A protein has these predicted regions:
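Gly-Asp-aromatic-enriched flexible segments
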Residues: 27-185
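Bacterial N-terminal signal peptides that target proteins for export
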Residues: 2-11
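C-terminal motif of bacterial Sec signal peptides marking the signal peptidase cleavage site
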Residues: 20-22
Length: 185
């Protein structure tokens, strides 16, 4: 009896919560525009300011499938995941990650956004094909001379950035960086 009386209310509340959450959940665009603000032309660059506390930073930069890009990272403030500010080699955290060994409980490794990438690794993806386009900086080729990463995208869509962490725990992340993206061809 009680179940029948509250079922319509619960259904309405669940639907409303899903719609409202869809505005902010990574990769879900129920009420928003999925078109990026700009697409880079050949040899054109764009800079964005990235905070590690953002679980899904939509850059408004459109990537074109089959095109090659260069990604340069300049860290402005020290990166930290809660109390972890150094990797296993006692070096300051950067876009490259830290090992699961530094987590207080090893099982937490199963909760990070991408289990095939390390903690706090800078991740990139495109909005229209989030699974196929998901890459960590460890997947990209690194050019020591220019201190930048190169990659080719396999689909078109808006560039989204985040560090590999547990969803819901981005608020304890600290740090910022300038991300420069250049389309090479």
């Amino acid at each position: 009896m009680i179940f029948n009386r509250y079922l319509p209310r619960m259904t309405c509340m669940m639907t409303l919560a899903t719609l409202l959450a869809g505005c902010k959940l990574p990769g879900i665009h129920l009420l928003g525009d999925d078109e990026p603000a700009m697409t880079l032309a050949g040899d054109e660059s764009q800079n964005v300011f990235f905070f590690t506390s953002d679980s899904s930073f939509e850059t408004d930069i459109g990537l074109v499938g089959g095109s090659e890009y260069r990604l340069s990272i300049t860290i402005f403030s020290n990166w930290a995941d809660s109390y972890i500010a150094e990797n296993e080699n006692q070096e300051a955290l950067n876009e490259r990650e830290f090992s699961n060994k530094l987590m207080p409980v090893a099982l937490l490794g199963a909760t990070r956004s991408s289990r095939s990438h390390q903690w706090f690794e800078l991740m990139i993806r495109q909005s229209r094909c989030p699974r196929e386009s998901l890459l960590g900086v460890s997947d990209l080729s690194y050019d020591e001379d220019s201190r930048s990463y190169r990659f080719t995208v396999n689909c078109s869509g808006e560039l989204t950035l985040y560090v590999n962490d547990t969803f819901g725990f981005y608020g304890n992340n600290m740090g910022a960086a300038n991300i420069a993206l250049t389309r090479l061809n």
